[in-house]
Amino acid sequence: RSLIAAALLTPLVLRSPCRRVTAPVIGGAVCYAAFNYCFIISTKLTTSANAIMLQYTAPIYVALLSWVFLRERIRRSDLLCMAFVFGGMVLFFLDETGGGTPIGNLIAVFNGVTFAGISIFLRLQKDGNPVMSMYLGNLLSALIGLPIILSAGLPDGASLFFLLLAGGLSALTYALYARASTGLTALETVLLPIIDPVMNTVWVFLTLGERPGALSLLGAAVVLSAVTARVLSAIQP
């Protein structure tokens, strides 16, 4: 998937007038690769709910680091949004938390740190080409996973189709994410994607008919409302 994503991101990198490989570019790439593998490993060693919940502790680290490295002040609306988002996430995963191993939970916490690192390093490139970090990060992820790919053998037709689909979606989403980071604060770049696990419940319900519980619905409503209110407050003149 990462190799396909890197191939699709290549034209964006080549067409950009800014192709310098700076320290923030390398930092973003390393954090992105670490983020990919930490998430995969954490879902194997702890519950999926724990892995996702601990991953989205990233706003805490961003709130601390963005002032130090970016001099971006945390506004009251940011703090309110964070409080409601965390409350909603707790409700969302309340029935699913528990279990897993301490090392799995620890890796999931570190995954939140790497997610925060991506946000900080992309924001440091606001006057450059943050897509370069995503490009190099995908290349690094592919390089790390190359021994596993070679030992697994060639994929069948169905697996190849899903690999192409996943690679294409990954390239599209992270290209957009990198571009959006140039016009958002570091905290906003980690708060807005929290909609992702919430919407997963909606897609699973629509496609597979798996009905979410009352707490999940309440948590989803809280998260969506908090993020929407934060976005609307940011665009008001």
Where do the language-model regions lie?
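Specific alpha-helical transmembrane segments that line the substrate/conduction pathway
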Residues: 2-4, 40-71, 111, 186-205
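Hydrophobic/small/kink-forming positions within alpha-helical transmembrane segments
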Residues: 3, 29, 33-37, 59-64, ...
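Hydrophobic/aromatic residues within transmembrane alpha-helices
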Residues: 42, 47, 68-70, 125, ...
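Helix-helix packing/entry segments at the starts of transmembrane helices
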Residues: 51-57, 122-140, 170-206
